[in-house]
UniProtKB/Swiss-Prot annotation:
The keyword Protein biosynthesis does not apply. Homotetramer in membrane. The keyword S-adenosyl-L-methionine does not apply. Two helices (H2 and H8) are predicted to insert into membranes and form pores by assembling into tetramers. The helices are contained within a helical bundle domain that undergoes significant conformational changes during pore formation to allow exposure of the transmembrane helices and transition of the toxin from a soluble monomer to a transmembrane tetramer. It is found in: Secreted; Target cell membrane. It comes from Latrodectus hesperus. One of its GO terms (molecular function) is RNA-directed RNA polymerase activity. Expressed by the venom gland. Iso and Leu residues are assigned by comparison with orthologs. This is Delta-latroinsectotoxin-Lhe1a. Its main location: secreted. Belongs to the cationic peptide 01 (latrotoxin) family. 04 (delta-latroinsectotoxin) subfamily.
Length: 147
């Protein structure tokens, strides 16, 4: 199982990348990573809890229609620690909000690939697969085929 430190390192590596991946609608089962997140010292869980308390969103919710999962927020706050959940939620500039969404979704896909490639044996891949929409399943199949 990934440790808090390895997740922290993974996030730092991913945040430095500027990739051109397609952005599938991937629903990560956040509970699978909660234990590794709480093992870190970078405050990711605190940020996630702040968002949960602010927006009352399910930890297993899927990103669509500009709704972020807590994992999206955790990654975004990792890169921008000074930004608060309230400022993001109150942002009425749809173009700016969408632009941020695209950046964070690319990071989420990178993180998803990292776990699939490095910790596949610890994840319930069938459960992950069942949480994807049809487009996500097609794109995940391509990812797995090209591993």
């Amino acid at each position: 199982e990934p440790s808090g430190n390895s997740l922290s390192s993974a996030l730092n590596e991913l945040l430095d990348k500027n990739n051109n991946y397609a952005i599938p609608k991937v629903a990560i089962i956040f509970d699978d990573f909660k234990s590794s997140l709480t093992g870190g010292d970078d405050g990711l869980i605190d940020n996630v809890i702040e968002v949960l308390n602010t927006v009352k969103v399910s930890i297993n919710s899927v990103t669509e229609n500009n709704n972020w999962t807590p994992l999206h927020f955790a990654i975004y706050f990792k890169k921008n620690p000074a930004v608060s959940a309230v400022l993001i939620l109150e942002n009425k500039d749809i173009e700016a909000r969408t632009s941020i969404m695209l950046i964070v979704q690319k990071l989420l896909l990178e993180l998803y690939n990292y776990f699939i490639n490095n910790y596949a044996e610890t994840l319930d891949e069938e459960a992950l697969f069942n949480r994807l929409d049809e487009q996500g399943k097609l794109e995940l199949a391509l990812i797995m085929h090209n591993k």
